[in-house]
Amino acid sequence: MTHFETLTSDEIQLLEEAIPLIAVLIAGADGHIQISESDWAAKLTHIRSYSGLEDLKEFYKQIDANFKIKFEEFVKFLPTDTDARQKMISDNLSNLNKILQKLDPLVAFHLYTSYKTYAKSVADASGNILGFHYVQNEEKPWLDLPMIHSIAEPV
């Protein structure tokens, strides 16, 4: 992952773990994480490993290899209380801000945008009713990932 060579292995791990954490954040916002939400989040991760932005394909390949294990670990070890879980995930994701600043501005923008579109895609799946995408009210406050500072597209 040549775009991440300025980062430590711990920082790269935090960036990678953000994907299953975002999936748990969105899927669990209503207090119930369904198998279909977990499966869809895993499928999204896999799709992004071969389709999408070229500079993030290798990143998603790394995540795809262990996504289900990480997702299940987070569900198992994070608090079962929804508010406590959401806060813990939010606090964890806020640690990405310092790491994203170390990246090339375009890569940071792509990664930030990718996190947000991933969150939206997970929400669409969890609220899919008769083929219509519906974002549940509990998910709405988390969709823009307010704990991660906005990154503008470089000029």
Question: Which positions does each model-derived feature cover?
Answer:
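Small-residue-enriched hydrophobic alpha-helices in membranes
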Residues: 1-28, 32-155
